[in-house]
């Protein structure tokens, strides 16, 4: 008899806990409606399938249509469906398994856009990166045991703790499948040009056809997170930890997820409020290096107004010839910032018995090494990725105009060396040291991060900096060197974050392509930003709706508490 009574009390506590959990879910589901303006709610209702209501369940086909995900991309659809499924259960991210409704899609929008999430959760330190990683790592189709016991769930005072602990999530245990992340990032990169504004029109067919092209740049980002991944096939059996994910995004790709935020807010606009992205004309005359997909990778760390407007081709070695003279004639008239691109194939001579097999075959390379001073074998510490992937791509952002500098240096603290392939890394100029670039027309070539070479009748000698990129005067060979701190450039951001700034290595490579592209001046870029801001403000203006003509949508507004009784609508 006593056992029966005890069991009844236990069941009662469990049911009470479940009820309180459901009440919390209902509270946040209803709260999400109050975070949106009248126009946003009406627009969203207009975007869901005809005849469907906010509390109806969402099908995969709805996700495909509303978020421009190709119907034949099973991996991408699965990733997004799981993401929405996880967010639908906020704040009980791990303890609840409710299905996705159209109302919870609105909740997902709030949770993935940081500015909205801070208001929605009433938490200034809300971390949208953590929330996204949870949605990518948890599998909501696999029901697990609740992480929190009934006593914790039944204590109303602990709800703030539930939210701020992300429902007791242990981030050290979370991992994202690298293949899922590869597909996810390919879509995000492809969207970077389409979603430069929240209300840009998106061509689904064009987006679907271009996704394969963006997988190569997505792979560079994935390898940045996990250097043990070499090829796309490696992604199938590899994973990414939260530390790897967050370090890569925060340190070298801070703009990576901006297109996702734009996409999430895209559903808050009616078709009539969308604008043609005339500001985003396809890049004219793309080259082997600079094309739509490469621009998307640049946009992960450079401001969008630099990458997606007034990007002007100045010099392409394949077209104008690989010479300092051609470079000078094409580039030196540009009085605004530029980006120098250098692509090549790494020379694998570190494993040779004598370290000079290629030098024996190529006397020009042998002479270059004698002038430069090859890093000693015992100081060459290349990881597996660097050894197996020969292709290298560097970009150098320079604010100062180019000029002949046979004695002095130019370039200020904004100069950056960026590695784009096979991984992404950023090397910042030391703000306390002046001058970091030379363009030497008497045989010294181009140097970033080095002192001027000494050139005499009987030869020359380079003085590479601790972190530097050197290009010989024939634009045939290049060397990127990394010895740590002490030069005019700092060690890589990720390298430093991982505590590996003292690791020494260098990439010696045969140059295949050299390009220089001009960016707009500050005045032009400011005008572009103002134009985009005007476009978004204009969309908001057009979005205003006459509430008296809403008819059937009035019930939706009453549900959100925007109209009804003594209210007349408006935003919360």
Swiss-Prot record:
Domain TLDc: 288-520
One Pfam family from the record: TLD
Intracellular or extracellular location(s): Cytoplasm
Cytoplasm keyword on record: yes
Protein keywords: Cytoplasm
GO cellular component, one term: cytoplasm
Keyword Magnesium: no
Top-rank taxon, per record: Eukaryota
Function comment: May be involved in a process influencing telomere capping.
Family the UniProt entry places it in: Belongs to the RTC5 family.
Protein name from the UniProt record: Restriction of telomere capping protein 5
Gene, per the UniProt record: RTC5
